[in-house]
UniProtKB/Swiss-Prot annotation:
Gene3D superfamilies: Leucine-rich Repeat Variant. This is U3 small nucleolar RNA-associated protein 10. Involved in nucleolar processing of pre-18S ribosomal RNA. Involved in ribosome biosynthesis. It comes from Candida albicans (strain SC5314 / ATCC MYA-2876). It comes from the Eukaryota. It is found in: Nucleus, Nucleolus; Membrane. PANTHER family: BAP28, HEAT REPEAT-CONTAINING PROTEIN 1. Pfam families: BP28CT (PF08146), HEAT_HEATR1 (PF23243), U3snoRNP10 (PF12397). Keywords: Membrane, Nucleus, Ribonucleoprotein, Ribosome biogenesis, rRNA processing, Transmembrane, Transmembrane helix. It is a single-pass membrane protein.
Length: 1818
């Protein structure tokens, strides 16, 4: 930008808020954030200030920093402060204050208070102009909120900062920009991103940043960085430095008072997010990584309040680090606590890649505690990482700090477990050996090393007891006081001495270790015996490095050799050496094998009387030492042969075989010293004082031997086992120090010593008690181990008391809800508990034994007031509750055992269970305890017990005194749980077949309960229980020989039927079907139907229509499940029950009353009904049966009708008997119906019942296939047999049924020939005969309807009905129907039926019926005319419909012969007001489709003109007429249209006069109706014109013009305006349709139009609507002019002046039409000559010389504006001519004229001109 331009811009910015005129000032002042511009323009500063201070006060409450603005921006003096009058310094300070306020108000833009405050800055200080940039920056995070639009709106477009130019479009549209636009702006303009980043940096520094701003920056920055992921170079050069600068500011530790904790958190999380994204896109250098890490960890809150985000960002940051894995200074002080470890574990589970970050922290913090804690998170499968860690361990192995050495040991052990080979390889590469490292770390790293190596005792000879290196050690502090290290009393001293020994050895050469140890032993220990116990224990301690242990063994050998003086016997060491031979290390075993050989060798050379070495050190003060004799000890040594010793070296388990198979079973001649050897060895092993290193192997050896069961375990029973719980913690500590896996090894072995086969019951009881204690021990490991031992040894406990203790303990653990590591219930279910044990356990928890049993005769549960009172007492209640819990668990276990079909079931168990059932009822009722689950489990146990008993082959005998069905019934009734009830019902069902005599006496209560409760349950279990109970109890009753089984069934079904409303709907059918199949269809279906009928009758009586319908639906679904024969049999039996209902009221006490009363299916309710009640019941039951038969979908495969058809149609011989059975049952039902009709028509007249019987009879006959049906009704239809009203009614019903059956069922295309012949030969003649005789009106109607149905059905298929014989019969029948027996009858019903019959015949025979045409159509039309005077509108409607159907039939079949009556037919159809329009429309469509269209058009026009159909009062009828006319025109040929053109034009003129006709008749139709009809008129006319050519249409159009102008050919007296309106409406539509084709037709209109326009301008004619339509017509003509029609001079002259003259007095409402017409005209005739004329014509109407009105000027100005818009530069040449007049208009007195010119015309001209018009105007 040039210097001059920049100066001008600066001046412009400074003076942007300076307004030199009132309008500009008003405009500036009207810009507001909260007010409408018009409202804002009127407000003064005092009002605005008042509102602003309210907002400021609210903001001050939220943030005290706003208070400082009260004395500056919002001081009272600011009201009168005009920034345009201030000095430069004042303005500078003002801008700083405004900027400070805007940055501070950013977080509160969503509040109304902030807008009120900022409003003051905008209105008073014009911040929207001078501080626009900052306003947008602070509001930008709210770009999706309306407040952002408000901010943009108040900033003038010219003052919008250039960097925000991309917002112009959104500002203009007042829309919020989408997020994509914001991102696009950042993406495309780095300077904008840099600008915003620097603004954010200032916000951070000034502590004014807020959450929305951070979210906005983060979302856009992340997306921006991602978009440059493929252009790293550009990203690195431009964006990354900017982003890193901002991120660094965010990471700086913030001052607490300046920021809230939430903003501090947001800053940190924002920076973390950006760093994470950057690190994934851009590979940072090591320096940047370190710098960012330092920045992150510099804040002390990073690993406190933001642990997880900090760890995530650090892991993401270092994830792609490719440099060397070395110490990072930033990580040196990295502190890892439990919280951080927990977070790391969480991140690891969430699959974060932590490996690089963790290994760097590990290396940087090594070898501190932090490094060891990180080891689980390091991927040791990475070879590089593995080697680095190994080398670090080696480098730090010489440390003297115990804590560091401990960490190094743990790390090294982890490495060896992870990859032993790689660990070994790495050590070798660094010239290290495992033994050396173990010595340095003074701990064992590899448990089994080089098992193939052999123990080398060669260096023993070179060992000395005094070497130089040891002399540097101060032994005065290490003097031992222990008497023996075989005693745990001296464990602490042993550990201290051992630690010092390892320290000495680690500093010495490995080759000198034996000498060092010997010297150490000599210096530290007072006696060689104590020294030997120390060395022995060191050699057996796994925590000691292997090399030291081997050296210790060598030292022991040297010491023994030195002590072997021929008088010392060392055989007491043999048991300890045997323990050592069980060691896991082969080298250790090999060393002790050498030691054993040495002892044996010394023993064999000894003489008698030798002293026992280490006796006191081993046994201490123990008196009973169990030594073998010297002779036996020598024999023992001989048993330990060289082969045995070698075996133990190779396989330590061989020790067990040598002990138990060789030594303990040894025989020496006749003596058996083996038992002494056993005592000797086990006495020593079981010494309580021995340390864990010895005990562990002893326990393990005996435990393994005890797997097969051995009494040797009892050596440990009184000592180790009995004291285990008290000494366990001590042993755990010892094992930990000694390096023994206590929980997985030692404790398992101890528990393995307990249990197994035992010869002593006392010991078994002791062991079971010990296991019980172990099961409830707080230690989870001991619990699990003891639980496993119980599962292993439970069956080996012979005493039932021992097993019962264990069972009870496990149940107690369950009851007490103790937290244990195993599942006691799973254990109990897995244990093999036999029946006796169950009986013992259940007996021990039975409740109520203290309450005496009542006598058998009473058969009631134990319950009394005293027991209730007793249960109230808390102590008893608590005891009962505990027993209940225990009982419940035992029952669950029993249920599990019974399900597994273990040998548990038995009658004695069932007896106990029954006793428990009584007790539970007592607890539930009297104690109010929750017994439902226990009862349910008990019921399951009882059920399973009975089922298992039934499946066994043994004979079962029950004690009827203890196993009683009444107890079960009582429990069923008392229990509120459906599950308990159902299971007990199943118990009864199983008992019924196993022991029917037990339950037979309780059948009635059982059935009553099932009916009252079980059937109501909505679950599969209840349904199954119910069905099983019925299925098993009823057969048991029958097989037991009880006579009144039927009564039982009736009682059962009556109970169920009573509960029917409460049975879930979806279960009803399944329930009753299963009952029926269980009880037998013949014995139960009719009962169910009858009982359901009573339910139906009861619901009908109570007006419960929904319930009665649901009964019918149920029975319908129920019947589907049975065959046709079964269903019919059930209905027959139902009718018999119906017949048992008495006709008259019964006398109470009579025999008939008693019989009925005693039957459950009738009961007292029916027996006591009065006569009227009985009549209602009979009718309702039949109605029920009738509805059931009629409600089904008879075409379903499962319907009775289909099933009957399948039986009756099947011709196979095997089905003959079934067919006869079905027909016999059907005849029985129809006979019942006819007999009942006779009874209740004659003997006991009941009209309502007879009506139901007729319906029932019809539905019954409807079930038959057609051929059977026809044969069954023909005789009843013969009029000769109709002797009384009953037979007539039967015949009528049969005829109606036949009609319905033929209509719905007959498919002639697939009809059987037998049916067709039966219809033609039997049914039709009978019907025609009946029609001819006309016996009864209703019967006549039925016969005619049936006749028409048959003819329609069979005639449509073209079968035998097309034959001449049948045709002849039909023609004869047509002759009968057209007489007074049909068409000429007086009854509407008969007339309608006869018309249907005629229609059916005409449909088939067509032209063959022409001879009877005069007897049909004219009478039909007369019948139609008679409907207008008929009082019964419904009959009239039916008659009209029937006539229309008849006419449509004739139109289709013989259309040519309908021409003569076409006008009458059309008038009939169009005037049938009672018939729906769509029906009449379809009939009219038939006329259009089937008849000559020219004739149809002619008839339609004649109906309108001559019949004056337009006078019809129904606009719908006229619409129907027009629709038909339109359809006719659309379908007819052009030739046909031309022939009828004159007549059609007459119709069209009449149609155009329709509006006048309506107005003349008191506005017969409303305006909308008229418009709708006129639209149809125009549609018909245009469609017709389309059929004509120019030659044929022009004269017609001329006639139409003459009618419009002069009224020539008018049929009504119409005024000029009305005609012209009608014509021009039509003509305008015609122009829109034909466009330029019809432009030339305007010649017929030119003069009349010109004359009309002149009359309008002169004011002699006032018709605004007509004027508007003419202008629209002219506009269309100008627009569609393609042949310069209007450019012809004469036409131009004719229309130009009249058209422009309309400007003089045009109405405001239609001015726009004139402007459009003139501008279109100018565009159409554009030429220099015509334009000049038009300009001068238009000047007349804007010039003051002609005294034009303001309205004239305004419309002229608008016209000129539109012309310039359309013509553009073509009219610029006339600008000099127009300028004076424009200038004149700009100074017009009328302000509206001035504004119209200034805002409209001048702006348009300037746009076209491209420069201001001021130069021309001046």
């Amino acid at each position: 930008m040039s210097s001059l331009a920049s100066q001008l811009q600066s001046i412009n910015e400074k003076t942007a808020s300076v307004a030199l005129d009132r309008k500009q000032r008003s405009k500036l002042h009207s810009r507001s954030l909260i007010f409408d511009p018009k409202q804002a323009a009127t407000q003064d500063y005092e009002y605005i200030y008042e509102i602003a201070t309210e907002g400021l006060e609210d903001l001050c409450e939220l943030d005290s920093r706003f208070n400082k603005f009260k004395s500056t921006l919002f001081s009272e003096t600011s009201v009168n402060l005009d920034r345009n009058l201030q000095t430069k310094d004042v303005i500078s300070q003002l801008d700083k204050n405004i900027d400070a306020f805007l940055t501070l108000v950013g977080p509160y833009y969503g509040l109304t208070s902030s807008l009120k405050a900022v409003e003051w800055l905008v209105r008073r200080f014009h911040a929207n102009i001078h501080n626009a940039e900052l306003m947008i920056l602070t509001a930008l995070p709210y770009f999706q909120h309306p407040v952002f639009v408000k901010v943009l709106n108040v900033i003038p477009k010219q003052n919008l900062p250039q960097i925000f130019e991309w917002l112009v479009g959104y500002k203009d549209q007042l829309k919020t920009p989408p997020a994509s636009s914001i991102l696009k702006a950042f993406r495309n303009d780095f300077h904008f991103f840099n600008f915003y980043s620097k603004f954010l940096n200032d916000q951070i520094k000034n502590h004014t940043v807020y959450k929305e701003q951070l979210v906005f920056y983060l979302s856009n920055t992340v997306q921006l960085l991602a978009s440059f992921s493929k252009n790293i170079e550009e990203l690195n050069e431009t964006h990354i430095p900017v982003v890193l600068e901002t991120t660094a500011l965010m990471l700086l530790p913030q001052q607490k008072p300046k920021y809230s904790s939430s903003i501090n958190s947001d800053l940190k999380l924002t920076s973390y997010s950006i760093i994470s994204v950057l690190s994934s896109i851009f590979p940072f250098s090591a320096d940047i990584l370190k710098s960012l890490t330092v920045s992150i960890l510099e804040d002390e809150d990073a690993l406190k309040g933001f642990t997880k985000p900090t760890l995530i960002v650090l892991s993401q940051l270092w994830k792609h680090f490719q440099g060397n894995l070395e110490v990072i200074e930033a990580f040196k002080n990295f502190k890892i606590g439990q919280h951080e470890l927990g977070v790391l574990d969480e991140l690891k589970n969430e699959n974060y890649q932590l490996s690089t970050f963790i290994i760097l922290v590990f290396i940087s913090t090594f070898p501190s505690n932090e490094s060891y804690k990180l080891l689980p998170f390091i991927d040791l499968s990475n070879k590089t990482v593995f080697e680095i860690i190994t080398k670090l361990v080696l480098q730090n192995s010489t440390t003297q700090e115990d804590s560091i050495r401990s960490n190094l040991t743990k790390i090294a052990q982890s490495l060896t477990k992870s990859d032993p080979k790689l660990f070994q390889t790495t050590l070798e590469s660094e010239n290290w050996k495992v033994d050396e490292l173990e010595l340095k770390l003074m701990s064992v790293l590899v448990e089994s090393k080089n098992d193939e190596a052999e123990f080398d005792a060669g260096d023993e000879d070179n060992a000395v007891e005094d070497i130089e290196i040891v002399k540097t050690v101060d032994f005065t502090k290490l003097q031992s006081t222990a008497k023996s290290y075989f005693n745990t009393e001296y464990d602490e001293e042993f550990n201290l001495v051992l630690k010092e020994l390892k320290s000495v050895l680690s500093a010495s050469d490995a080759k000198l270790h034996v000498s060092v140890i010997l010297t150490f032993l000599q210096k530290v220990f007072s006696t060689p015996e104590v020294a030997l116990t120390f060395a022995f224990r060191v050699a057996l301690t796994p925590a000691v490095p292997l090399s030291i242990r081997l050296s210790a063994i060598k030292s022991i050998r040297i010491k023994i050799k030195n002590a072997a003086n021929g008088k010392t016997d060392f055989y007491l060491l043999i048991p300890l050496i045997l323990l050592a031979l069980f060691d896991n290390s082969k080298l250790i075993r090999s060393g002790f094998a050498q030691l054993l050989r040495l002892v044996i060798e010394i023993k064999t050379k000894l003489t008698t009387g030798a002293a026992l070495f280490l006796e006191r050190e081993i046994y201490g003060s123990v008196s009973d030492k169990k030594y073998p004799t010297p002779h036996d000890s020598l024999f023992l040594c001989s048993l330990l042969s060289e082969d045995n010793v070698k075996d133990t070296v190779l396989d330590p388990s061989r020790v067990i075989n040598i002990l138990f198979d060789s030594i303990f079973k040894a025989k020496n001649g006749k003596s058996k010293p083996g038992k002494y050897f056993r005592s000797f060895i086990f006495t020593q092993w079981s010494l309580c004082s021995l340390p864990i290193v010895l005990k562990a192997n002893a326990w393990k050896i005996v435990a393994q031997a005890n797997k097969a069961g051995t009494d040797d375990r009892f050596f440990f029973l009184d000592g180790d086992i009995e004291n285990y719980f008290s000494k366990r913690n001590v042993w755990i500590d010892q094992a930990s120090i000694a390096g023994i896996a206590f929980f997985d090894n030692a404790e398992v072995s101890v528990v393995g010593l307990v249990g197994g086969v035992a010869s002593n019951d006392k010991n078994s009881n002791t062991e079971s008690e010990w296991l019980c204690r172990a099961l409830e021990n707080p230690s989870g490991n001991l619990q699990m181990t003891a639980n496993n031992r119980v599962l292993e040894t439970f069956d080996t406990f012979k005493p039932i008391e021992s097993r019962l203790k264990i069972v009870n303990k496990l149940v107690d653990i369950l009851i007490n809800d103790d937290i244990v590591e195993f599942d006691p219930m799973a254990t109990l279910q897995e244990l093999n508990i036999d029946r006796n044990l169950f009986l013992q356990a259940l007996t021990s928890v039975q409740i109520g034994d203290q309450i005496p049993e009542q006598g058998i005769a009473k058969r009631r549960r134990r319950s009394s007031n005293s027991t209730k009172q007793a249960m109230v007492r808390d102590e008893i209640n608590n005891m009962a509750s505990g027993h209940l819990k225990k009982l419940t668990f035992l029952l669950e276990i029993l249920e599990s055992s019974l399900r597994k079909k273990r040998n548990v079931a038995g009658p004695d168990l069932l007896k106990v269970l029954f006793k428990i059932l009584t007790d539970l009822e007592y607890l539930g009722n009297d104690g109010n305890l929750p017994v439902l689950y226990a009862q349910e489990t008990l019921a399951s146990c009882m059920l399973l017990n009975i089922v298992n008993l039934k499946s066994s082959s043994k004979e079962v005998k029950f004690d009827s005194n203890s196993i009683r069905a009444d107890l079960i019934v009582n429990s069923i009734r008392a229990s509120p749980s459906p599950q308990v009830q159902n299971r007990l019902l199943l118990v009864i069902s199983e008992l019924a077949s196993l022991a029917p005599e037990v339950i037979l006496h309780s059948v009635m209560p059982i059935f009553t309960f099932m009916g009252a409760h079980t059937v109501r349950q909505d679950d599969e279990f209840s349904s199954s229980a119910l069905q099983q109970t019925v299925a098993k109890v009823i057969p048991a009753l029958a097989s037991n020989g009880l006579s009144p089984v039927n009564n039982e069934i009736e009682f059962l079904l009556a109970s169920f039927a009573t509960a029917f409303p409460h049975v879930p709907r979806h279960r009803r059918v399944k329930l009753f079907v299963s009952l029926t199949k269980t009880l037998g269809c013949a014995e139960s279906m009719h009962l169910i139907l009858f009982l359901m009928g009573q339910q139906y009758a009861n619901n009908v009586h109570k007006n419960k229509n929904g319930d009665s319908q649901s009964v019918v639906e149920f029975v319908h679904g129920y019947m589907k499940s049975f065959s046709a024969e079964e269903q019919l049999a059930g209905i027959v039996a139902f009718t018999k029950l119906w017949n048992d209902i008495p006709l008259n009221q019964l006398e109470p006490g009579s025999e008939e009353f008693e019989v009925l009363n005693n039957r459950p299916v009738f009961g007292t309710t029916i027996a006591t009904l009065g006569q009227s009640g009985l009549a209602v019941l009979r009718n309702d039951l039949l109605q029920f049966l009738d509805e059931t038969l009629s409600s089904e979908n008879k075409h379903e495969l499962s319907s009775l009708k289909t099933k009957m058809a399948l039986v009756l149609i099947d011709d196979e011989d095997s089905e003959v008997s079934k067919k006869e059975s079905v027909l016999d049952k059907f005849r029985a039902i129809t006979s019942f119906a006819l007999a009942s009709l006779d009874t209740f028509t004659n003997s006991h007249a009941d009209i309502k019942l007879c009506s139901t019987l007729y319906s029932l009879l019809g539905n019954l006959l409807d079930l038959l296939p057609l051929n059977y049906f026809i044969d069954s009704i023909v005789a009843s239809l013969d009029v000769d047999t109709l002797s009384d009203s009953l037979s007539i009614k039967v015949a009528r019903n049969y005829a109606i049924l036949a009609s319905r059956k033929f209509e719905t069922e007959l498919n002639v295309a697939h009809c059987d020939q037998v049916v067709i012949e039966s219809v033609i030969n039997n049914l039709l003649p009978i019907l025609i005969k009946g029609i001819k005789k006309n016996v009864d009106v209703e019967l006549q109607q039925a016969y005619l309807d049936t006749f028409s149905t048959i003819v329609n059905k069979f005639g449509a298929s073209g079968t035998e009905f097309a034959s001449s014989d049948v045709s002849k019969v039909l023609i004869e029948s047509l002759g009968i129907v057209t007489t007074d027996r049909g068409l000429l009858n007086e009854q509407p019903e008969v007339i309608i039926a006869s018309i249907n019959a005629i229609t059916s015949i005409v449909n088939i025979l067509g032209v063959k019926t022409l001879g009877l045409f005069p007897k049909v159509v004219p009478p039909a039309l007369k019948i139609w005319e008679s409907t207008n005077s008929l009082g019964d509108k419904e009959s009239a409607k039916l008659l009209q419909g029937s006539v229309l159907v008849l006419l449509s039939c004739y139109i289709k079949k013989i259309p040519a012969f309908m021409s003569t009556t076409l006008e009458a037919v059309l008038l009939t159809i169009l005037s049938s007001d009672l018939i729906d329009n769509h029906i009449r429309s379809s009939v009219l469509d038939l006329i259009v489709d089937h008849m000559d269209l020219a004739q149809v058009l002619k008839s339609l026009c004649n109906v309108w003109l001559t019949k004056k159909f337009y006078t019809n009062d129904n606009s719908g009828n006229i619409g129907l007429f027009l629709k038909t006319l339109q359809a006719t025109i659309n379908k007819m040929e052009k030739k046909q249209a031309t022939t009828q053109a004159t007549l059609f034009m007459r119709w069209l003129i009449s149609a155009f006069e329709f509006r006048q006709y309506s107005e003349d008749n008191d506005n017969k139709f409303d305006n909308n109706t008229i418009h709708r009809l006129e639209s149809s008129f125009h549609g018909c006319a245009i469609a017709f014109v389309m059929k004509l050519n120019d030659k044929s249409f022009r004269p017609l159009f001329a006639n139409l013009v003459r009618w419009a102008v002069d009224g020539e050919g008018a049929t009504l007296k119409t005024n000029e305006v009305s005609r012209l309106l009608a014509f021009f409406r039509f003509f305008n539509k015609l122009q829109d349709e034909l466009k330029s084709i019809i432009t030339s037709y305007f010649s017929y209109l030119l003069d009349p139009t010109s004359a009309l326009l002149k009359r309008f301008s002169e004011g002699s004619l006032v018709a605004t609507n007509l004027r508007r339509i003419i202008l629209i017509g002219l506009t269309s003509s100008f627009k569609y002019d393609q042949d310069d029609y209007w450019s012809q001079q004469g036409r131009f002259d004719s229309i130009c002046s009249p058209l422009l003259s309309q400007l003089s007095n045009i109405e405001d409402s239609i001015g726009k039409y004139l402007v459009k017409s003139v501008s279109t005209f100018v565009t159409d005739v554009s030429s220099d000559e015509y334009n000049e004329t038009l300009v001068h014509e238009l000047i007349k109407y804007i010039s003051n010389a002609n005294e034009n009105s303001a309205a004239t000027k305004i419309w002229s100005i608008r016209t000129l504006k539109t012309i310039f818009q359309k013509m553009g530069e073509q009219w610029l040449s006339y600008l000099p001519t127009l300028v004076p007049y424009i200038a004149e208009l700009l100074e017009d007195d009328d302000e509206e004229v001035e504004m119209e010119v200034r805002r409209g015309l001048v702006r348009v001209i300037e746009n076209v001109l491209g420069e201001p018009l001021d130069r021309y105007l001046s």
